[in-house]
């Protein structure tokens, strides 16, 4: 955001800004690209003076806890390639997700819960597809893939015993299956057989750990009030934020929350407000909650999407309505917690918020920085596959963004 952007409303985006850059097929045929001024009020908050929208008042209130990165960028311009890219470090399918990489590299301190858990909530906007490969293990051993917790019914499918099967009989069945699997492993030395044995055992232990984890009756009323009106509604973002904190307390090292609905090609003024209502209070509450419990210094909270949106209107621009197309050239994310510099604003874009003019942060740079916070050198964190030492940050190279790190982490 820049105050001068309000003067640009309705004027054509100069061709020099686009400079022949690729845009989506949804707007490539437009004859006019009128700029749209910010639809909401922005004010500066915190010691950093970062600008926050009026529809994110709770995130604005933690401005001094976060680093605001205004120069994130990606080459992808459509949803699935972009989500795949930011999760796996490449637009090509078949690569491990960040959670799988970290599960592989760091392991999990919990014997009773997976090392990587995914939860999905749905906003009130249109929902793009989310494929299970986004939390998959790719070419890493399959034991490192994420486990999706469902928003209704059984959190994990087939975890509960079917009618007529007791815990004792389930134990006996597993022992018999494991004996067969161990014999097969002795014959073939296939590591995936060991993975299967371990996953069966984990599922058995989760029959006790998951019900305890997902029972929010033990949470006091003030916690629900802190997270907002949806905090008691399964499947909502606020509910998932509380579950995420409980997972972290129980030793789950990597929790990923997807909130769908951020695709306002039309009806921006209405739908963006609704989406922000879903996430603003819970996201800020999670940071505060972790801090109050002494957990924030050991936890990294990352909030953002796969790309930004254009300054120009998609379709006609009217007094009350407009849309915005995908824009990967620059967008904003924020981070908080262990190793992250507090109250900092990083990066700058041009007057049209179309291109980055200072301190660009590619998504692979962002992932390299997260690994640094976890004590991992992203260049040495590799897995040999197809003749290459594969990395989460890609084989082309990435850099740690030291400017958003606390001083103690710059030289690990």
Q: Predicted segments — roles?
A:
Residues 1-409:
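Ligand-binding pockets and gating/stacking loops
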């Amino acid at each position: 955001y820049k105050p001068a952007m309000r003067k640009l409303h309705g004027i054509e985006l100069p061709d020099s800004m686009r400079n022949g850059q690729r845009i989506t097929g949804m707007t490539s045929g437009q004859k006019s690209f009128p700029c749209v001024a910010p639809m909401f009020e922005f004010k500066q908050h915190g010691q950093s003076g970062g600008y926050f929208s009026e529809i994110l008042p709770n995130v604005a209130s933690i401005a001094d806890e976060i680093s605001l990165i205004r120069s994130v960028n990606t080459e992808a311009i459509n949803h699935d390639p972009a989500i795949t890219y930011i999760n796996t470090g490449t637009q090509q399918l078949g690569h491990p997700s960040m959670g799988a990489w970290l599960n592989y590299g760091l392991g999990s301190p919990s014997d009773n819960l997976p090392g990587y858990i995914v939860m999905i909530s749905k906003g009130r906007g249109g929902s793009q597809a989310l494929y299970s490969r986004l939390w998959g293990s790719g070419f890493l051993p399959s034991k490192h893939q994420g486990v999706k917790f469902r928003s209704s019914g059984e959190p994990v499918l087939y975890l509960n015993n079917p009618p007529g099967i007791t815990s004792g009989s389930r134990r006996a069945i597993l022992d018999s299956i494991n004996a067969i699997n161990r014999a097969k492993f002795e014959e073939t030395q296939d590591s995936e057989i060991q993975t299967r044995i371990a996953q069966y055992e984990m599922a058995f232990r989760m029959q006790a750990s998951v019900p305890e984890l997902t029972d929010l009756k033990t949470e006091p009323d003030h916690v629900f009030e802190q997270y907002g009106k949806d905090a008691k509604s399964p499947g909502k973002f606020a509910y998932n934020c509380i579950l995420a904190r409980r997972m972290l307390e129980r030793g789950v090292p990597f929790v990923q929350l997807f909130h769908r609905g951020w695709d306002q090609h039309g009806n921006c003024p209405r739908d963006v407000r609704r989406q922000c209502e879903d996430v603003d209070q819970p996201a800020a509450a999670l940071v505060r909650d972790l801090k109050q419990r002494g957990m924030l210094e050991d936890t990294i909270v990352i909030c953002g999407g796969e790309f930004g949106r254009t300054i120009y209107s998609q379709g006609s621009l009217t007094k009350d309505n407009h849309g915005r197309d995908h824009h990967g050239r620059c967008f904003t994310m924020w981070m908080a917690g262990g190793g992250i510099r507090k109250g900092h604003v990083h990066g700058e874009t041009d007057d049209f918020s179309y291109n980055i003019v200072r301190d660009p942060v590619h998504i692979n740079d962002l992932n390299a920085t997260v690994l640094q916070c976890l004590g991992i050198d992203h260049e040495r964190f590799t897995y040999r596959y197809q003749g290459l030492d594969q990395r989460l940050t890609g084989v082309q190279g990435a850099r740690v963004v030291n400017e958003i790190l606390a001083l103690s982490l710059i030289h690990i």
